[in-house]
Amino acid sequence: MLGNCIENVRKNVPLVHNITNYVTVNDVANVLLACGGSPIMSDEPEDVKEITSICGGLNINIGTLNKRSIEGMFAAGARANELGHATLLDPVGAGASTLRTNTAVELMEKIRFDVIRGNISEVKTLEQGSGTTKGVDADVADAVTEENLEEGIAFAKAFAKKAGCIVAITGAIDLVSDADRCYVIRNGRPEMGKITGTGCQLSGMMTAFLTANPEQKLEAAAAAVCTMGLAGEIGWSYMQKGDGNATYRNRIIDAIYNMDKETLDKGAKYEIR
C-alpha cells in the first residue's frame, strides 16, 4: 500500500537538495519538513556539487531560471547521477519561452532523471519540443479529463518509455506512469489552483519519497501525489467563513504534517491501468 512510502520518509528523514524557484522556495522547504524529509537549497555553481554530495535526492525546478542557476542545475545533476541519487525534474513553464523549453530539453538529454513531474502542457512540450503552456499553467485544451483519459494514459506510458523514467502529470486527474503501469489518481480540490506553488511543493516532497523508497519509485511517486491531493481535501475540510487562500496553504501543510500510513491508505483515490 502507498502508506508505507510516507512511513519510510518519516523513518529515514531524507536530505533533499532543491534547486527550485524563488517564488515558492519557503513553502517547498516547509512541505519537505512536514512530510518527514529535510530540505537544503542551493543553486550556486561553486556550491552545488558539495551540497548534492551530502544529500540523497535532487529536485531541479526551472521556475525562475537564470544563467547562474542553469549552470548549477547541470553541475548538481551530473554529480547526483555519479552518486546514484534520486533525481527529479520539474519543467515549470516549459513551452512558455525558448529559454525554458531549451533548458528543460537539454536537462533531459544530459541528466538521468527518475521522475519528470509537470502539468500536461509542460510534458507535451518536452515530448514535442514546443508547446502551448500558458505561463506556468496548463493549456485548457491539453487537460486530462474523463473523456480523453485513455489517450492521456497512452501518452504518459509512451513518454515514460521515450524518456526512460517515470512521468507524473498533475492536474484535475493525475497520471503517474512508467512504460507499463499508470496510476490514475483523483485526489485533490480545485481550490488548490488558487495557491501558488502546490506543484513545486509536490516536486520537493516527491523527491523525498523517491529517496526513501529506492526499490519502489513508481509507488513512491504515486504516494506523493496522493499525499498532496489528500492534504488538499483534508485542509479544505477545516476551512471556515472568512478563510482564504493563505489559510488554505497553511491547512495543506498541516495536513501533510499530520499524514500517516493509515490516513493515506484510507484516503488515496487511485486505480492502476
Identify the meaning behind each predicted range.
Residues 194-226:
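Short, small-residue alpha-helix embedded
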